A protein has these predicted regions:
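Acidic, PIN/NYN-like endoribonuclease modules and their adjacent C-terminal/linker elements
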Residues: 1, 107, 111-140
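Short, well-structured N-terminal submotif of metal-dependent ribonuclease cores
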Residues: 1-39, 47-65, 139-140
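Active-site phosphate/pyrophosphate-handling residues
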Residues: 7, 20, 83, 105, ...
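Alpha-helix capping/helix-boundary segments
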Residues: 8, 39, 81, 106, ...
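Nucleotide phosphate-binding site architecture
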Residues: 9-10, 41-44, 126, 133
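Short, structured coil segments at secondary-structure junctions
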Residues: 29, 70, 128-129
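Active-site neighborhoods of divalent-metal-dependent phosphate/nucleic-acid chemistry enzymes
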Residues: 45-53, 69-118
């Protein structure tokens, strides 16, 4: 199981995604790729804060298309993930490497499901015990 981080999903929404990222995603088995409710929220928030207009409408449509491809493969931030979140955040705090925002929620979902995380921001997930795949540097 591989979870796509927000930056990977956002890249797939671009009119011309980075060729390496697109090739990497296409090389995976569709059933192995997941994303999270956190990523869905981040992407939708980014779209909804835009002024009304053509760009916002286009991005809504693109997001519907991309997330529609996941249907049953959007993992929730549930009670078990919340417990892992507490462990991740407190562990990083003790190590002097605080982690904030949505990243620890995504990391906790990955840990709960024993999933790797495809992301461009590998350093953001250091010391979370999540296997990280940098889709911008992977060669296919």
């Amino acid at each position: 199981m591989i979870v796509l981080d927000t930056n990977v999903v956002a890249e797939l929404m671009r009119p011309a995604p980075a060729p390496g990222v697109l090739a990497w995603v296409r090389a995976q088995t569709t059933g192995d790729l997941y994303t999270t409710a956190i990523t869905l929220a981040e992407v939708r928030y980014g779209i909804e804060r835009l002024p009304d207009g053509r760009r916002k409408t286009l991005l809504r449509s693109t997001a519907d298309e991309v997330f529609g491809g996941f249907e049953e493969q959007i993992l929730p931030f549930d009670a078990r993930a919340a417990l892992r979140y507490a462990t991740i955040v407190s562990g990083r705090d003790r190590a002097g490497r605080p982690i904030e925002g949505f990243d620890p929620q995504i990391a906790s979902i990955c840990r709960e499901h024993q999933a790797a995380l495809a992301t461009r921001n590998a350093t953001d997930f250091e010391h979370t015990e999540v296997e990280v795949i940098d889709t911008w540097s992977v060669t296919n």
